[in-house]
């Protein structure tokens, strides 16, 4: 990750290293930004960003694919967001889809387990910011001929007051990656 930080010319970073082929989170930023670490564990990095007009919380989240660990990871995310009073954005690999249109070439429906992503959007009245390129961010197999594709990675936000009208970003652009089953987000 140090090579990426240096190559992209960012001066600062917070990193949760990946384990095997799972996990891994990173926030990079340049000097001059006021960023304060709020929470840091294997499933999330949360930082408070102080702007000249307001503060907001950025959460980078890795929703583990392992069923036995999902409840704990999502519980930490929900607790963090419940304790925060103000605008926030959450970006990451949620390892859930919202509906059947977010997957291709695979069996539709049949999900009996709790969909924590749907609960997050509902409980916090969050907004999924959408996408501007290929909606699928994960593929089983090579990207060009993948048997299954899904939209597992996304950005969700809660805006309060005037921030919604002043700071609403454009849809997230997600370029395809040739070396990982996930696409980087920017």
Name the predicted role of every residue range:
Residues 1-186:
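A shared catalytic/ligand-binding motif for oxyanion handling
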